[in-house]
Amino acid sequence: MRIQKLRQDAVLPKYAHGSHEDAGMDLCAVEDATLEPGVPRLVPTGLTVEIPPGYEAQVRPRSGLALKHAITMPNAPGTIDPGYRGELRVLLLNLGREAYTVHAGDRIAQMIVARYEAVEWVEGELADSARGTGGFGSSGR
C-alpha cells in the first residue's frame, strides 16, 4: 500500500508486536497537541495513504491512552475510504479532568486495513425472520 510523508518528521505506521500478532498499526502525532477536557481536537499525522479499491482503513483508539489518560476518539472507528488522499488526522477527545499533551512521535491511534464489500440495494418487501422487529433490549439481560 502506498504511503507518503507530508512532513519529513512524520512516523510511518507500524505494528508494535509485528504483523503476525497485531491487527492494528500505530499512528503517531507529527506535532505536539494539548487536549483540553471535553474539547475534540484533530491531531495531524503528517501522512497520506493510497488505499487500494475494495479496501478501507479504520482508525481506532489506543486502549492504553483510554485506560491511563481517558483519551478516546468520539468517531471511532474513523473510516478512511480508498479515494481519500488528504492528510490522516485523528480526532481525539479528552474525557479526563485535566489537560493532556500529546507530543510529536507519540502513538495516538491504531489503523486497521481490511477488505469491504460494496452492496447494491434491491427495494422490496423483506422476508420474515424469527427475531422480527425486536431491537434494543429484545434479547434480555
Language-model regions: role of each:
Residues M1-R141:
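DUTPase catalytic domain/fold
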